[in-house]
UniProtKB/Swiss-Prot annotation:
It comes from the Archaea. It holds the Pfam family DUF749. This is Uncharacterized protein MJ0858. InterPro entries: DUF749, MTH1880, UCP005648_Ca-bd. SUPFAM superfamilies: Hypothetical protein MTH1880 (SSF75412).
Length: 113
C-alpha cells in the first residue's frame, strides 16, 4: 500500500489553556509542540488538541487571535492529515471570537483616583 494514498482525518477534541493541558493526559503532546515551535509555555495560552481518527495519535497547536487556519491545514497536510469540516468551522469561530475579544478590551483608565 502506498502511504501517499492514505489520508487521515483530524478531529478537534478540545481547546484548553496550557495550564489545563499540562494537568491532563495531553501534557507530553503540549510539551512536544512547544519544543517544535520553540515556544515558551505560558499558563493562559490556548492549545487546540486534535485526535487523528483511527489512531492513538494527537496533534496540538497553539491558538491565538493571529492563528492562520490555512497554515495549520498545511502542517496537517505534511502528515497526510486533513481537518474534518466541523472541526475547522469550530476552530474558525473560536479564533474569530479571540479577535473580537482582543479588539474590544477596555482601555485602562490611567486617571483613576
Amino acid at each position: 500500500m502506498n502511504d501517499k494514498n492514505v489520508e487521515f482525518v483530524a478531529t478537534l477534541i478540545s481547546i484548553l489553556t496550557v495550564k489545563e493541558a499540562l494537568n491532563s493526559e495531553m501534557e507530553n503532546f503540549v510539551k512536544v509542540r512547544a519544543a517544535i515551535d520553540k515556544r515558551e509555555l505560558k499558563d493562559d495560552d490556548k492549545v487546540a488538541i486534535f485526535n487523528i481518527n483511527s489512531t492513538t495519535s494527537y496533534q496540538v497547536f497553539f491558538i491565538d487571535k493571529d492563528t492562520n487556519i490555512e497554515e495549520l491545514k498545511e502542517e496537517f497536510k505534511k502528515m497526510n492529515v486533513r481537518i474534518n469540516y466541523d472541526s475547522e468551522q469550530v476552530l474558525k469561530r473560536y479564533i474569530e471570537r479571540l479577535r473580537i475579544q482582543n479588539n474590544s478590551k477596555p482601555i485602562s483608565n490611567n486617571n483613576k483616583q
